[in-house]
Amino acid sequence: GGIYTDEHANLNITKTIDNKDGEIEASKSIELTAKTLANDGSVKTKGDLTVHLQDGLVLNNAFQAGGSLDFKTQGNLTNNSQLRVGNKLSVQAANIENTKEAEISGNETHINTNTLTNRGLIDGALTVAKAVTINNLGTGRIYGDHLALQGDTLNNLEEDNKSAVIAARERLDIGVDRVLNRNESTLLSMGKIYVGKTLDEDNQAAGKSTYVHNHNGVIEALNIYDDAKSKAITFNTGVVENKHFFLETENVDTSSTSVFEYRIGNDSTIYGKDSGVYKVKQDNKSS
């Protein structure tokens, strides 16, 4: 079935909206409030979209909003879709999983959750992700012109031989107490990187974190926007541990040179070919 309007649509449902193979479309805006959204179907507007739920949601068919999207659920969100909006995208849930082929992106992208697990793409001109734990794994990519992360723990880790990437096109702020970047995973900024304990009101790193552990990973700030080339990376942390655990060494014969050396009799002295002349005088005795 379908619900259509050229104006604003306001759906306030106390229990469940079952939108299997259904369409909810409004030209100007949609406000959808319910306990449960089952079988997400198509929810589409040229304007702003608000979706507030009590129960969790597995999103297989992306919401479509030409303006902003404000999504909140008291449960968990698993995103399997290409969730892109034209303006501001705000996503809040108990826990959020953005799967391998999925995307969460807007002009501004704001994420608020307990545990964020990303194996897909999160992007925005401004990207701000706040969570207790941020897990960016394997195929996971978190991008932003200005990218700001806040949490107790950030794990930027390899998975299934893929290395995760967190990258800012201009500025990267990491306001996270404990950071682990591992096995060729990358923390990158085309501009500068700032590391602290939390984010301030301008989404810039503030305070002193406990540690940054870079284990076989890459942390790089290209600093291309600063003509003066001032400090590219600022760590305000107790410990920076930068280790390569899998360094292998071997002896390689790159060249060889012939050397002539000699010694006389039982003499312990070793002479080179240019050491001079050694004369031996031996008395012949007969019995």
Language-model segments: which ranges?
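Binding/recognition "hotspot" determinant
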Residues: 1-287
